């Protein structure tokens, strides 16, 4: 992180990242961040070059870089956009491309801020499959409670910058009173239709 916390600690594999001698560079190669707005993340002219950036920065050989990039593009189902210029892409295409940039890094941890924003139903479903297949830690900030219900086993509900509760996703996301007290609604899949 850029700003040290005023309290608490962050540990990776049991070691505080604030301990003397800890190499943040090593941690940065293990953690991927998907921004809420892909325009803040994508900066190259085309998708292929952008997705190559992270693996190249790891110092990987070009053959491995291309292998990772092609795998990430295929995993996200955007290999057909490989050479497309970013400024010509839709919001959903940019979001999927920004996720591919992180997957190409093969991180141990993915941090995502509102990952389903701007996605059409097919790409949203694809994202859910990707998240369910991701075998490592994923930390997701989202108001898409249906997606959270499908992809996360644990939920930390926050309101006004404070933790309201921390627990089993199904228990929290099925508690209508708790959700409404904190400005949320039941996931759509659990709401009764009003006709």
Q: Can you say where each PLM-predicted feature lies in the sequence?
A:
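H-loop/switch region of ABC-family ATPase nucleotide-binding domains
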Residues: 142-143
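Catalytic Walker B motif of ABC-type/P-loop ATPase nucleotide-binding domains
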Residues: 110-113
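Conserved ABC ATPase "signature" region
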Residues: 63-81
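A short, surface-exposed alpha-helical micro-motif characterized by mixed small hydrophobic
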Residues: 148-150
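Conserved beta-strand-loop-alpha-helix hinge in the C-terminal portion
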Residues: 162-185
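Conserved ABC ATPase signature
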Residues: 85-89, 93
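Conserved ABC transporter NBD signature motif
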Residues: 8-19, 27
